[in-house]
Amino acid sequence: MSHNNFELSPDYKDIDKKDDLNPSIVEKGYVEGVVDDVQPERKSFITKFFDDFKPAISTDEDGSALKRSLKARHMQMIAIGGAIGSGLYVGSGSSLSDGGPASIIINYTLIGIMMFFVVYALGELSVAYPVAGGFNTIATRFIDPAWGFTISWNYFINYFITFPLELTTCAITFRFWTDINSAAWISIFLVIVIIINLFGVRAYGEVEFILSTLKVIATLGFIILAIIINCGGVPTDHRGYIGGSIIKKDPFRHGFKGFCSVFTTAAFSFSGTEFIGLAAAEVDNPQKSLPHAVKQVFWRIAVFYIVSLTLIGLLISPDDPNLMGNGSTSVSPFVLAIQEANIKGLPSVFNAVIIISVVSVTNSSTYAAARTLHGMAGLGHAPKFFKYTDRLGRPLIAMVVVLLFGFFAYINEADKNGNDVSDTVFDWLLALAGLSNFFSWGSICLSHIIFRLAYKRQGRSLRDLGFVSPMGIWGSCIGLFFNILCLMAQFYVSLFPIGGKPNANDFFQGYLAACVAIVFFVGYKIYDRSHVPSLDKLDISTGLRTYENSDEEDETSSGFKHVLKKIYGAFC
């Protein structure tokens, strides 16, 4: 056979037996045989489309068939804008109404500080163990199999429910323009999410890269505009200079209860920050990509959450009837701030940005739920058939189950009789999803503490790790403390609700996630009778990626210059 028009890659050298063929060669669509007979097999689009649904041929070193297709740019944009969505743009309205502007600024700052420590701990663990299931798999090994089982299902339920919840939010957001049946909008966005998932993790990464870029640009634009509005620089705004006149009126609405109630919605706003750890099994170079992504989280918290919400507190009164849950229409406080400045056209533009953000969070929710269910199957925490992965690296069965649950969003149709069922469902799901994040984030911190203690006890050097959290164990201790504090505050608000007496409905609506977690943990303990391993016997070697002298420092730098370099390296 002539080879003038076909050059063999190094993968084909010295192959003279069918059994010697690398599985990756088969996956590329080449015919097995001796070298002289190797030729590309041409397949039609239809044939290739259906072949992609067949079981994956090769697996990663951790036994997962997920493909490492996410690049550094994907991870950085996911870290910066991946969780900017309905929690910030819409959920902040109910936070402002319940707790007032001072409460929202303080609470979002506290949750932001907590997330700063959580994400750095997560970065260290994810670079060391870039495995399927992410931090849920790590918690199973380092904390307790029963607790790993609990938070894995807890995390899955979180995003499994968030998927139809965000579809519902899409329909609510469209009420700004029209009263068209919610089912129409739900159907459109459900189809969009299904199409994105059909193209695998690379499509998810590209879509998130584009949507996150748009969200970042829009939020920065709003910050600039909000400063101008507050200073009285908008000709159509007859209020003139606003300054701190609004925030002084009712800074802590509903007192201490209102202050505590903001924790749940703040947590929901920050949900998704941990995606960079969950995606570690699908990143092409975890040691390079993940540390950069982790460092971007600080800027997202500082700029996009703290600054934007501070400006919202300066511009919107907590008793405004148009805030989420107060009036007949639900308007984002971001859109409301532009409306009250009498700027024509721009509110519709920003409302479109909110819809883009909701689509992004919806897409991310399906990703998180499907990958978590796939990871649980690998640990034996879920039926084995959920581990099925096709040739595109899609956890196909897990993905289909999650997408099917999206049809639950059609419960909005029950509102035809004026029952307000969709609003009730939104409240219940928001409370469940928001509280469950504390369990996941607390587990990340606790896993990091145990990992560091075991790592030191077994005589290993941190210099061999690909990324070391500059916050160390103490940073994780602070993060864990904040998570426990948030759970206590939410328990108080659930037991003694704002403007009412203790009742079962409010308590379970606010603390249902804790009840579910207790049932799962006790149930697994009874079934498996798992135990907590000692630090000496804890398995930290399996799946651990070490890098010789990965944390080697420049010996020529010293003194103040060295300190500045360390600070810069921690945030940039």
From Swiss-Prot:
The keyword Methyltransferase does not apply. The chain crosses the membrane at residues 77-97, 102-122, 145-165, 180-200, 209-229, 259-279, 297-317, 341-361, 392-412, 431-451, 478-498, 507-527. It is found in: Membrane. GO terms for molecular function: amino acid transmembrane transporter activity. One of its GO terms (cellular component) is membrane. It is a multi-pass membrane protein. It comes from the Eukaryota. GO terms for biological process: amino acid transmembrane transport. Keywords: Amino-acid transport, Membrane, Phosphoprotein, Transmembrane, Transmembrane helix, Transport. InterPro entries: AA-permease/SLC12A_dom, Amino_acid_permease_CS, APC_YAT. It holds the Pfam family AA_permease. Belongs to the amino acid-polyamine-organocation (APC) superfamily. This is Uncharacterized amino-acid permease C460.01c. The lineage of its organism: Eukaryota, Fungi, Dikarya, Ascomycota, Taphrinomycotina.
